[in-house]
Amino acid sequence: MPAVDKLLLEEALQDSPQTRSLLSVFEEDAGTLTDYTNQLLQAMQRVYGAQNEMCLATQQLSRQLLAYEKQNFALGKGDEEVISTLHYFSKVMDELNGLHSELAKQLADTMVLPVIQFREKDLTEVSTLKDLFGLASNEHDLSMAKYSRLPKRKENERVKTDVAKEVAAARRKQHLSSLQYYCALNALQYRKRAAMMEPLIGFAHGQINFFKKGAEMFSKSMDGFLSSVTDMVQSIQVELEAEADKMRVSQQELLSVSESVYTPDIDVATPQINRNLIQKTGYLNLRNKTGLVTTTWERLYFFTQGGNLMCQPRGAVAGGLIQDLDNCSVMAVDCEDRRYCFQISTPSGKPGIILQAESRKEYEEWICAINNISRQIYLTDNPEAVAIKLNQTALQAVTPITSFGKKQESFYFSQNIKNSDTGYVKIVPKAAASIPETEELIAPGTPIQFDIVLPATEFLDQNRGSRRINPFGETEDDSFPDAEDSLLQQMFIVRFLGSMAVKTDSTTEVIYEAMRQVLAARAIHNIFRTTESHLMVTSQTLRLIDPQTQVSRACFELTSVTQFAAHQENKRLVGFVIRVPESTGEESLSTYIFESNSEGEKICYAINLGKEIIEVQKDPEALARLMLSVPLTNDGKYVLLNDQADDTGGSPSDHRGAESEA
């Protein structure tokens, strides 16, 4: 090793300027060494801290690998191999953590500690001796200054002797401190070289020992394991690349569709509508009432499940029941100036929820699907075929054609028009020969009229002359007796749904078939507006009265009513057949279908009682017996129903507003 610079101890006593200049160089070197040593210690402490952190990190990593098994992943299929592999790696991490802990201890003992000792012992010693040398030099300078001021008079010899002794003591002290200081500075030149090498030797030995033990511990046992894990990862990568290619192809195919897939209601004129659905899914807007007059619309996901309409909000795990669709009715409605709205009503006719579809196609398919489900055809062996046949029949009801397919089976509705408490009647199949075919009841292609009963304003505009002409062709009050002279007066709130010509009035099946065709036509053609009227049943006539003007819109003689019946499932539907003479001498038959606010069987009961009154009016005794069997009002009129006030809501003048929505 090259020789180092040294301070000459022989020159310490003389303390010449040259010696002082050389001393300042050594002091500057010691100061630089002190700064560097502090920075070196910080770097080595950082390495030691990182190694300690590595110990803690590997320990935490080992625990986290074991925690994978306890995560209960929702999609945990095929994780068995991953779990076993992670368990093995956790064991490896524990062993590796032991090596890291040992390395951290070695770094602390052989790298960090020597630097700390060098700084605290050698550098601190030099700094202390520097301070002592400075104090001794100051004392020597003061004593020399005092000695230099001694006077020349002989009488001060004693003082001179004392000052001389003081100078000698100060000079001896300075000489001793300078010798110690010079020796420490000379020794520092050697110690700094060793102090720089020792920590690095300790660091290198620690790392070598760490890697050597690690190689001995893992080289043999880990080779086979790492090879198998590598093969497994590579196979997963191959599967991933293959799946990614498939997804890219699928993505390109899905994105290559036309713009119509993204644009709602792009084909408004001629949408491709499937009317044979027995299940349906999709987003709809649900109307919710938030106050007396305020509403909100919420977009939710709806789907049918058997005979139930289910709703599942976004983010929910499962759907909930919204409404039972069995025997319900669905019809388009005009709601808050929104398009594509429809309402689902309960089997009793009570209005239910209102929904909005996003397009005409979705709107009509939802209506058709709910109609199909409400008929419970999903319970049959081949519901798709039944749905196709039913919808073909519904289309034939409103489409002029020349031939019909024969019905495969018919249904018979049992009724008792005098029993107002009759409940829900099940559909019972009968022999096909005992029930008339559809062609025997209603001619194929018979048109259906939906606007025979005109609104009051239009009726008044057409009849501002001296005589009013009824839209049905009937004359006004001149031809019929006043209701005040009738023994029977019963009023019901009804809405006209449609009318059509029929071929026979020998069975109530013709009314049921007309109801089916009218409702099917309304659903297919999205006709939802109806005109509300008051149906006044007397012992002579049936009157349809405008609730706003109290003007009769139509009037039929009770004797011309040959059949009347209420629907056995939707109890608010009622219809009757009218026989009207023609100018040619023949008679025509027409069926009129209404929806009532009360049960249709009550209207049938009133009509039946009116016809009985007509029959017994010629026989005073029979009339008296009939009057005794029926409760009467104070003025002698018949009281038909206990809840008459509830059905009619009071006098006819109390009802205003001709338009309603079915």
Curated annotation (Swiss-Prot):
Annotated membrane topology is: Peripheral membrane protein
Its quaternary structure? Answer: Homodimer. Homotetramer. Binds RAB5A/Rab5 through an N-terminal domain. This interaction is essential for its recruitment to endosomal membranes as well as its role in cell proliferation. Binds subunits of the NuRD/MeCP1 complex. Interacts with FSHR; interaction is independent of follicle stimulating hormone stimulation. Interacts with APPL1; the interaction is decreased by adiponectin in a time-dependent manner.
Region (Disordered), start-end ranges: 643-662
> Boundaries of each PH domain copy?
277-375
The source's domain of life comes to: Eukaryota
UniProt lists compositionally biased (Basic and acidic residues) regions at 653-662
The record's Pfam families line, in alphabetical order, gives: BAR_3 (PF16746), PH (PF00169), PID (PF00640)
State the name under which the record lists this protein: DCC-interacting protein 13-beta
Domain (PID) spans 486-635
Localisation per UniProt entry = Early endosome membrane; Nucleus; Cell membrane; Endosome membrane
One Gene Ontology biological process: positive regulation of cold-induced thermogenesis
Q: Does the keyword Repeat apply?
A: no
In this chain the BAR domain maps to: 3-268
| Presence of keyword Flavoprotein | no
Tell me, in a sentence or two, what this protein's role is: Multifunctional adapter protein that binds to various membrane receptors, nuclear factors and signaling proteins to regulate many processes, such as cell proliferation, immune response, endosomal trafficking and cell metabolism. Regulates signaling pathway leading to cell proliferation through interaction with RAB5A and subunits of the NuRD/MeCP1 complex. Plays a role in immune response by modulating phagocytosis, inflammatory and innate immune responses.
